[in-house]
């Protein structure tokens, strides 16, 4: 396992549409291992392969929270070629953040429940229902695979403000 660099807005790679994974290979397994290590190190609860400059339809997630004793039991999840096949009419609002847009959080409205179809690390096609934060995280990460960022759901004014801030920061870092 190794840490990978997380690409940051305004990197144009974040707008790429990721390609389907044809087969779960040792390289895909290594990518998944690296993604988990990178996600946990950041720390974050979800990561799409494109965020580590790999335009493949792969997502890692872990929504585990510390228990009463402060211990966190990991609940790693892998979604290969995920697609939302059903969503509720009911909406919910969660404050979202993104490892590729560090230290910026905003409320986003999305379907409260979704059904997702994906391939697991064993190459098995699965379907699963998700609700609450789990559903929000799945939708957020699948958006990444389609070149969509959570700031795209904000007003034009807010989105432009965020883009300007991160573009300036990138220019300063390049100087």
From Swiss-Prot:
Entry-linked InterPro entries: Peptide_deformylase, Peptide_deformylase_sf
* Positions with a binding annotation for Fe cation: 98, 140, 144
The protein's gene is named def
Catalytic activity line of the entry? N-terminal N-formyl-L-methionyl-[peptide] + H2O = N-terminal L-methionyl-[peptide] + formate
Q: Name any Gene Ontology BP term.
A: co-translational protein modification
One example GO MF annotation: metal ion binding
Cross-referenced Gene3D superfamilies: Peptide deformylase (3.90.45.10)
Q: Which organism is it from?
A: Bradyrhizobium sp. (strain BTAi1 / ATCC BAA-1182)
> Cofactor note, please?
Binds 1 Fe(2+) ion.
Q: Which family does it belong to?
A: Belongs to the polypeptide deformylase family.
Q: Which residues form the active site?
A: 141
**Record key words, sorted:** Hydrolase, Iron, Metal-binding, Protein biosynthesis
Please state the Enzyme Commission number of this protein. 3.5.1.88
Report the protein's function: Removes the formyl group from the N-terminal Met of newly synthesized proteins. Requires at least a dipeptide for an efficient rate of reaction. N-terminal L-methionine is a prerequisite for activity but the enzyme has broad specificity at other positions.
Q: Which cofactor does it need?
A: Fe(2+)
Provide the protein name. Answer: Peptide deformylase
Which SUPFAM superfamilies does this one have?
Answer: Peptide deformylase
Q: Does the keyword Kinase apply?
A: no
